[in-house]
Amino acid sequence: MFKRILVPTDGSELTAKAVAAAIDLAKAVGASVYTLSVKEPFPYSAISEMQPVPPQEFFDAQERIAAERVNIVRTACKAAALACEAHTIEAVHPWEAIIEHAKTNGCDLIVMSSHGRSGVTALLLGSETQKVLTHSTIPVLVVR
């Protein structure tokens, strides 16, 4: 069955459902949990004087937020007596980072939440979950 389950987190309420499902599944099959929070890169501007936040402040804030997100998952895993490996990385395209992280860590399942978009909104905006589903060779469990 599954040995290593990756559950990416963006800190949302919907992601919390995916985390709970990943923990339940990991307990049932004896798997370990990996969690990942993807940080946004700094939005450099051609007009450097117009930056709303200095780059270092931006990076520090992104790291703090990402660390808080993975620590929530780590704490939930600890409460369930599960091993959890937590990582934060920076990427332009979170879906690519999620797939690459799963491959690099030998994960055999990715658990993600569906953000519930439908119709034209889903078509125009897409979602990281949809992109992972489309491009991943690793099985993906989508929690709604």
PLM region descriptions:
Residues 18, 45-48, 96-99, 122-124:
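Short, well-ordered secondary-structure micro-motifs
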Residues 75-110:
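Structural beta-alpha unit
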